[in-house]
Each structure stands twice: as structure tokens, then as C-alpha cells.
Amino acid sequence: MNEPTPLSRSFGYQSVDEREREQRIRRVFSAVAARYDLMNDLMSFGIHRLWKRRFVRMAAPQAGQHIVDLAGGTGDVAALMAAADRRVTVVDPSAEMMAVGQARGHAHVDWQVGSAEQLPLADASVDTLTISFGIRNATRIDVALREIHRVLKPGGRFLCLEFSTPAWWLRPFYNLFSFTVIPRLGAWIANSPEAYTYLVESIRRFPDQRGFAAMISAAGFESVRWHDLSFGIACVHVGTRAAAATPAGTA
């Protein structure tokens, strides 16, 4: 029996080398940037906006924090967390996606080009790092998780909103919609059926809730847990970087 292609060398159901995977994914987001948010509305019937608001409530942004929204794209999640009394930064490898967000004039949001596997951030410099619907596009998810752990302050929190594995009774309907409707919407709205075929296939290749939680724990995070949304169609994983140890005799 053939072993499944590692995620780092898969573009949806296709086997490619890591370099080719990175290039293809960047081309996908460059091609769909202008219609990305509209497609999300159509594909999810607008429910992704409710998921993101729930996600931001879980992130609980506070005054004085440095918050990074990784793979933040057009900045819709960052805009929900932004305020004058905190620093919110979108880090994304796609300049085209960020340009769409910058044109919208989101207040109190900074923008920085960077990849999840090599974050342009100092060690222990971030209070909260969020990522929504982006971690499965990282070529080396294990490396990305270690990088996220590196840049978080002790006690800092990582929150990831991602498509996941829905309840068994929902899967036949979910699969029918995903493989028939979504690529057609991609062709009609974004003129990019290939991009949305990749989207659907990449979701199926991504680990389920328990499997991804294990990856987060393996990267060094503590108190890892998850919360299903819409019967598991999407899921929020949360992990914490361990707080700094108190030196003996100082308590």
C-alpha cells in the first residue's frame, strides 16, 4: 500500500515538491485576492463572519497587547481586534492579499510580509497570535507551530481557526457541496476553479481535531484544547506558551 503524500509535498491531492507547493499557493492567493472575501461569504453563506467574531471573542484582545494575525490576508480578523490602545499586526506572505486590506483603510492595523515558517518577529515579542484558515497552507506546519511558539511571550496564547472534520452525519452533504458547488463558484466569481479545488482538497488532507491538537502540543504548547463550530466544519484550537518559571526563593 502506498504511503500518503506528506502534507509538505501535497497541493490538494497532487504530489509536488515543497518549493513548487509554496509557489502554487502564492499564485492561488495572488489570483483570488480581489474576490477572496466575497467567495468566503458565498461559500459559507456568510457564516464565516460569525465564526470569526466568535474567534475574536475567544482571543480577548486587551489594551497594551501586541497581537499578530498570521496569514491575515485582507485584514478582516485584524480589524475586529484593532484599537488605538494596542498593536495589531497582519503578517502574510501575499502582498496582493494585504493590498486589498490596506485599500480598505483598516484603522490601527500594521502590515508586514512574512511566512509562517520564518516569522519576521523577535523572540517572545507577541502576547497573542491568531491565524484563521491559513495554517494548512503552511508548507511545514510543524516548523510554523514552533515559530509561533518562539515569538509568543511566556504565557502568550495561540488561537487557530481552521476548517476541520465535521460530524459524521453531516459529511455526505458537506462533501457534495464542497466538491460540486465550491469549484463552480470559484470559476464563476473568482475565475479560478483550480484555486477552490485546492481549497476543498487541502481541507480533506488536514488533520482532524485531535490530530492537529497533538501537533500543537508537540510544538511545545500547553493547555491545548479545541472548540468545534457548526458541528465541526470549522474548529478553534487554543494553546499557551508556558509562563516563565519563578526562580526558587522569590515567591
Curated annotation (Swiss-Prot):
| Transmembrane spans | none
Query: Which CDD domains does the entry mention?
Result: AdoMet_MTases
For the protein in the UniProt heading, the enzyme class is: transferase
GO terms of molecular function = 2-methoxy-6-polyprenyl-1,4-benzoquinol methyltransferase activity; demethylmenaquinone methyltransferase activity
PROSITE patterns with a match to the protein in the record: SAM_MT_UBIE (PS51608), UBIE_1 (PS01183), UBIE_2 (PS01184)
Organism superkingdom: Bacteria
Explain the purpose of this protein.
Methyltransferase required for the conversion of demethylmenaquinol (DMKH2) to menaquinol (MKH2) and the conversion of 2-polyprenyl-6-methoxy-1,4-benzoquinol (DDMQH2) to 2-polyprenyl-3-methyl-6-methoxy-1,4-benzoquinol (DMQH2).
Please report the name of this protein according to its UniProt entry.
Ubiquinone/menaquinone biosynthesis C-methyltransferase UbiE
In the UniProt record, the gene name given for this protein reads ubiE
